[in-house]
Amino acid sequence: MESSVDEEALHQLYLWVDNIPLSRPKRNLSRDFSDGVLVAELIKFYFPKMVEMHNYVPANSLQQKLSNWGHLNRKVLNKLNFSVPDDVMRKIAQCSPGVVELVLIPLRQRLEERQRRQKLGVGSLQELAPQDSSGYMDMGLPQKVRGEGAPALGEQLREGRPLASRPPGYNQALQGDPSFVLQIAEKEQELLASQETVQVLQMKVKRLEHLLQLKNVRIDDLSRRLQQAERKQR
């Protein structure tokens, strides 16, 4: 699968994330950001008073992840005139490869724009909103970042063309041959499949061990009865 956003945009995104101190080790962007906690931390890094971290619970369950994202959308992103649609939140919570990048790229732009305006002491939040009142899905990368002919982010997601999953040390995979990125993504998928296979085999082993224990109990019981019968015959 080819990357839908040009490599330079991704390169800049991973550098940005790598340079912000986060509470978790950076391993896999799709999984790391799936529960919304690290997104809240990114925003808090820029605007500490805007985010109360106790509202965001590290989660593995889909329900809690969606709860975190819903709260983030209503209480924080709304203040930035930024919104993540429900279907996109669900894809992020499900760790769909490449989807969270489509949120982080425009979110970074929004955060840095607001920070610049605050430093200059001009502009209100309303000035940060798109002129046509369009939402997140209609926001794209500036042409300079996207490169000539690159599609808008919202269009990419609508057409079902997510980015490839990225390996640990987000920016590292972009060094050297771009085909390395695809190879890493494929290896990650193979690893996940292997882990699932191992889990299934472990369950089978436990089941067989349980059956063996039952058989041993049965054998012991029969042996005891046989011994009792032999003693009676004597």
Swiss-Prot record:
Residues 181-234 are annotated as: Essential for homodimerization and microtubule bundling activity. Keywords: Actin-binding, Cell membrane, Cell projection, Cilium, Cilium biogenesis/degradation, Cytoplasm, Cytoskeleton, Flagellum, Membrane, Microtubule. GO terms for molecular function: actin binding; microtubule binding. One of its GO terms (biological process) is cell migration. It holds the Pfam family CH_2. InterPro entries: CH_2, CH_dom, CH_dom_sf, Spermatogenesis_Ciliary_MAP. Radial intercalation is a developmentally reiterated form of migration by which cells move in a direction orthogonal to the plane of the tissue from an inner layer to an outer layer. The Calponin-homology domain mediates its binding to microtubules. This is Sperm flagellar protein 1.
